[in-house]
Structures are given as structure tokens and as C-alpha cells.
């Protein structure tokens, strides 16, 4: 089998895995939304949505473009058999984007009252605080996904997305139902419970991706002793030049 045919088969196989994962996630998301709205009511769901509006902005700043940039850089380094380079790309990206994600999480957590006030929904502040750790978790998750995709391995990304959706469904709905229907808490507390399910889902997906990364490291070729990877500064510059245009258009 020629190398071109192998690449083509890998591409279409990866695309099929991603497509299947997206379909499963969409089905789970549809099942999730209907009972969530019923449990939270219009007021609680408004708090839930307000928290996600801020979350999505910070998520765009901290993660948009990372998987694509990482995938391209890892793929190019791997094609040239620069295995030290692939490891360094991963380490530099995880450190930098992880730090950016943690910063954005802190902004969301400590700025929750400010953001909620701007949106005229002060009750949403609690939801924002519960959701804040997810920004950092998704930043790390994006780096792991980009690394796997750089090796044309789409399975971990698809599995992690399904894990996210399932944990969000099970943990989120359970906590929202328990707080409102069993404990009789206000709607915004139920919304915070549902959002806790999101944070747990991101943590579960990140743990899976970290496990998959460690598992696959045992099968990666040993780098050549003479190989000299690029400097961290150059790697970061290249990654940002690839990621920033995607972030701007996201």
C-alpha cells in the first residue's frame, strides 16, 4: 500500500470517527436540554445561559485555534521524524495555554459579580463561579486533542466529547433535580448544580485524554540523539501565528 493511499485512508477514517462522535454528542445534547429546561424553569435556565455567555467569550480567548494549530505543527514534525520536536510542542503548548486558561478561569471566578451585573442577572454570579474552572480544563483538553489529531488519531477526541456529553447529562441533570425537587432550593442553585455537571464533564474528558496520551507514549518511536528541537520561543510564536487568526474569526 502506497504512503499516499495510507494517508488518504487515515484521513477518511478519522473523518468518519469524528462525524460519528458528533452525531452521538448531538443526540445526547438534545436529550439533555429538554428535561433541563423543565427542571430549571425559565428563570433558572436564564441564569444557566447567562453564565455560558461569559464562559464562551473567555473560552474563545483561551482555546480557539489551539487544536488546529497543534495538529498542524505535530503533523509536520512527525512527518519529518522529529520526535523531540513533537514532545516539545506539546509541553510548551500545555504550559502556555494552560496558564492562559487558568488566568481566564480566575477572571471569570473573581469577576462573576461584575459580569452578572452587566447582564442584569445577579443570580447568575454563582453559576459563573461554578463554571469558571471549566475554562482552564478546556484549555488543557484542547492541547491534548490537538496533539492526538496531529498523529491523525481522531478516536480520543471523539471519545472525550462523548464523555463530556454523558457526564453533563447524568451529573448535571441529577444535581439540578436534587437541588430543586428534593431540597427545594431556588432555581439559580439548581442552575449552578447543572453547571457543576459541565465542570465535572470537562474534568472527566481531560483525565481520559491525559490517560490516552500516557498510554500512547509507550508506542512512540525513540527520538534520534542528534535531533535538536526548536526553541520554546519559536514554537510558541509559530503556534500563536496559526491560532490567533482562527481565534479572531471564531
Show the residue positions of the predicted features.
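Alpha-helical transmembrane segments of multi-pass membrane proteins
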Residues: 121-144
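Interfacial/gating helices of multi-pass transporter permease domains
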Residues: 36-57, 187, 191-192, 234-242
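N-terminal membrane topogenesis motif
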Residues: 1-28, 84, 88, 230-246
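Membrane-interface helix-loop junctions in multi-pass transport and translocation proteins
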Residues: 155, 166-212
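Small-residue-rich midsections of specific transmembrane alpha-helices
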Residues: 49-74, 133-136
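Membrane-interface junctions at transmembrane-helix termini in multi-pass inner-membrane proteins
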Residues: 139-161
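Helix-terminus/linker motif at the lipid-water interface of multi-pass membrane proteins
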Residues: 27-45, 116-117, 185-187, 247-250
Amino acid at each position: 500500500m502506497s504512503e499516499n493511499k495510507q494517508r488518504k485512508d487515515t484521513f477518511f477514517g478519522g473523518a468518519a470517527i469524528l462525524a460519528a462522535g458528533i452525531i452521538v454528542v448531538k443526540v445526547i445534547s438534545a436529550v439533555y436540554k429538554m428535561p433541563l429546561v423543565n427542571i430549571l424553569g425559565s428563570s433558572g435556565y436564564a441564569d444557566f445561559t447567562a453564565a455560558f455567555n461569559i464562559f464562551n467569550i473567555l473560552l474563545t480567548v483561551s482555546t480557539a485555534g489551539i487544536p488546529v494549530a497543534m495538529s498542524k505543527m505535530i503533523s509536520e514534525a512527525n512527518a519529518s521524524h522529529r520526535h523531540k520536536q513533537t514532545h516539545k510542542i506539546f509541553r510548551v503548548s500545555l504550559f502556555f495555554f494552560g496558564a492562559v486558561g487558568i488566568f481566564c478561569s480566575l477572571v471569570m471566578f473573581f469577576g462573576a459579580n461584575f459580569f452578572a451585573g452587566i447582564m442584569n442577572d445577579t443570580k447568575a454570579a454563582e453559576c459563573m463561579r461554578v463554571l469558571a474552572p471549566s475554562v482552564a480544563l478546556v484549555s488543557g483538553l484542547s492541547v491534548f486533542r490537538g496533539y492526538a489529531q496531529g498523529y491523525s488519531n481522531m478516536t480520543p477526541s471523539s471519545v472525550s466529547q462523548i464523555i463530556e456529553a454523558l457526564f453533563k447529562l447524568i451529573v448535571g441533570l441529577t444535581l439540578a433535580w436534587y437541588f430543586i425537587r428534593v431540597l427545594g432550593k431556588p432555581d439559580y442553585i439548581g442552575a449552578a448544580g447543572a453547571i457543576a455537571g459541565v465542570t465535572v464533564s470537562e474534568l472527566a474528558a481531560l483525565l481520559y485524554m491525559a490517560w490516552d496520551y500516557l498510554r500512547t507514549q509507550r508506542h512512540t518511536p525513540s527520538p534520534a540523539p542528534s535531533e535538536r528541537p526548536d526553541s520554546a520561543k519559536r514554537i510558541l510564536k509559530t503556534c500563536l501565528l496559526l491560532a490567533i487568526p482562527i481565534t479572531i474569526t471564531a
